[in-house]
């Protein structure tokens, strides 16, 4: 019996062995999906590989442009200011007769008095800023991320006070008696707005200027005799270019900024994007001739891409204030740091900094009696783009809920600068005596020439043949 069982088992094994080649012959080789998709497991054609690497470099440059625009926006303002007025913690330019179209800067507000300066904590160490009372202001880092509001929404509650701004790497003692904040960047943007008084039928800037000139800035540890006296140059009536670069200097200025600031100022993933186009802190930036072409293409195309998004609007409609009207909010429902409910809205952030600067919690808060709102429109009531060749009437209803003031301003759609019309200040506000209609409403007119019967304070001049946006 044992011998018979062994023979049967051996025969069965031979039979199975005989079946294996047949089963294997019926199976087809399985290639992975990516192998099928990319050249059947072989390297790319060298020309295709070069082309794809160039395309990736270009796409990364576009992404870098959009991501770093908030910083370049601030750098443009700083460089234009310091070229005109000089730099230093003690230099605080004030637009004492209000800002007009001769100052090229994104969406300036001609209806308050602007004070703007650029502090360097790496050079000067911790700085103390004595802020005036009743200022509408903020300190931001150079990505225009709010360090703190100043004024009614800030810790001083419109009483003014001493703010202590610490560098990002500061580890020393922190004295009491200050509103103390630490900046993520060595460079800090100081932006104060002071409110004008109502004069004889028009705004009176003098009290606002006087208040702004009570600002003081000095190093925390400086000996009093070594503190530089404050300088308040007048920015009004001067032609000043404070716009961000539109050519290859965008990249050289970005590289200088990356080198100057601490590593922690920029998150690692963004640094990775910058590294992929050759911008690495502490290393030479030497793009090849081909990369120079791609960088130039990116700095030309990226702003068009941002503008295309602004022009076409959002599929989710979050940019609209009302479903039945054309007014938009430039934050599109996001926080002042561009956070939607579950993501960072990088496209909306880029759209904002193409035409504006200075985003703060006070601008997006929904608290009655506090903060500010900036609804704008690029279209008329029928949905057509506003054109400077046409005549438009904006009706402001009676009882506008503005505690301090309301204002209406026209801007260029491309970069938010003021239209270069004969009327240097394309703005009006509630400080003017503007005739009211029988129902208490006010009519503001936009046109290349003033319509008959319209008072000067109710007219905003536009540039024929050019689109514009109107902000309330």
Annotated model-derived regions:
Residues 9-18:
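Bacterial N-terminal signal peptides
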Residues 26-472:
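A compositional/structural signature for long, glycine/proline-rich flexible linkers
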Residues 1-10:
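Bacterial N-terminal signal peptides that target proteins for export
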